[in-house]
Amino acid sequence: MPTLYVRRVNLKDSLSDAEVVAYWKFLQEEFIPVAMKVPGTRSVKLYSGAGGLRADIILLAEMDDAGVYERWLADPGVSAMVAKVYSAWDMKTATQVFRREVTPELIRALSST
């Protein structure tokens, strides 16, 4: 079932401007291309709110199903980068949610008796 993974984070206040720029380059140039290779990953995009690329950052990953997240964690390329991805986050403010796409199939499954 098509799933949207949403991760909302703020970067740590202790990061310098240079570290923030390097982190964004890492996400764009290294992490996203590797995550996109995991079967079932449809898209991975990053969005920033009004926090100047430091706060109110949202990662949106469109996946074939919620199991793709577990495949990310099991994938050697992605798992090798997880610590670096998380290292810049203020984990006190980080949140994540999974959302199912409302499809005719989902409606039929939920309405059948």
Please place each PLM-identified region on the residue numbering.
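Short coil/turn motifs at secondary-structure junctions
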Residues: 12-14, 51, 64-66
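Basic/polar N-terminal segments that are highly enriched at the extreme N-terminus
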Residues: 1, 111-113
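A short beta-turn/loop motif at secondary-structure boundaries
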Residues: 47-54
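Active-site-flanking beta-strand signature of metal-NTP-handling nucleotidyl enzymes
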Residues: 2-11
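An amphipathic, aromatic/His-enriched active-site/gating alpha helix that lines ligand/cofactor pockets
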Residues: 26-42, 60-100, 113
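Histidine-centered divalent-metal-coordination microenvironment in nucleic-acid enzymes
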Residues: 56-58
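Acidic, low-complexity intrinsically disordered segments
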Residues: 101-107
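Short, conserved charged micro-motifs
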Residues: 15-22, 68-72
